[in-house]
Amino acid sequence: MATQKQRMYGFFMVIVGAAFWGLSGTVAQHLFETSDVSVEWLVTVRLLLSGLLLLMIISAGKNRRAVWEIWKDQKSAIQLIVFGIVGMLGVQYTFLASIGTGNAAVATLLQYLAPVMIVLFMLVTRKNSFQSADICALVLAMGGTFLLLTNGSINNLTVSPLSVIWGLLSAAALAFYTLYSSSLLKKWGSALVIGWGMLIGGIGMGFIHPPWDVDVQGWTISENVSVGFIVIFGTLLGFYMYLTSLKYLFPQEASMLGCSEPVAAVASSILWLGVSFGLYQAAGAACILVMIFVLSQKKSAGKSAALKKQTNIQR
């Protein structure tokens, strides 16, 4: 049982780690707006560097043998490749594409619709029974999304339709990522699966947009710092801090505190980039956050929290 001091340390780690995830989306938006960096290049570099660094850290630890052992299991190897290309790359590309065509605040909140998609999938496949919490979550999700995208006016979208499409695809990709990776994570652990998933996704994207295909001659300190922040803080360190928090907190607690990610994305977008965020949009964002709380409080909270843990660590 963790001491009070350890629990406070866990709270700090999960809140700061999730905030780094949220801030990385805002930094990516700033990068897209102020430079010629493309979504494809950033996805390639983010996944390649983060994956390599994470696998290097694992190789330096006690679990170094598992880095290559996973490839000796044919079933796991095939699952890992599918996870890396469809899951990891799918989530990263659609999320950053939504930011590139819209803004980080809306993209992050749309991606948080993934738990609702998971609930719907479970209901359709009859793996879960329908509960009152599911109805409440669906109503909150639909109402929150409507307010977020329209700011209360059905005639106007707050972001481009393309950004909405990418955002919804991001939520769908994240739902697949969460469900598909479950058996891999149980067998091999989060760090190893995520590390290889990132590297595989980065290699796959590299065939479309190689990491060296970028003009850095006009780059300033701002561009270099932005890319470094996205890779180190927004991906690697955020992931490490979240996993560390699970040593001292219950998964359900970490899951709830992980909601500081969209809060950080919205706040930084408004305060730093001057993104317009109306009263109705704020109400919509609140609905989505309440939806996450409702789902985490279901009787199957243990399983839901585990799924939410897998959902969070992709960023």
Residue ranges and their predicted role:
Residues 8-13, 40-60, 82, 137-143, ...:
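Hydrophobic alpha-helical transmembrane segments of multi-pass integral membrane proteins
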Residues 2-3, 30, 50-73, 120, ...:
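Membrane-interface helix-cap regions at the ends of transmembrane helices
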Residues 62-105, 147, 231-249:
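Specific transmembrane alpha-helical segments of multi-pass solute transporters/efflux pumps
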Residues 1-44, 156-183, 203, 307-315:
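Glycine-/small-residue-enriched transmembrane alpha-helix faces in small-molecule transporters
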Residues 49, 53, 110-124, 139-140, ...:
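Alpha-helical transmembrane segments of compact multi-pass small-molecule transporters, enriched
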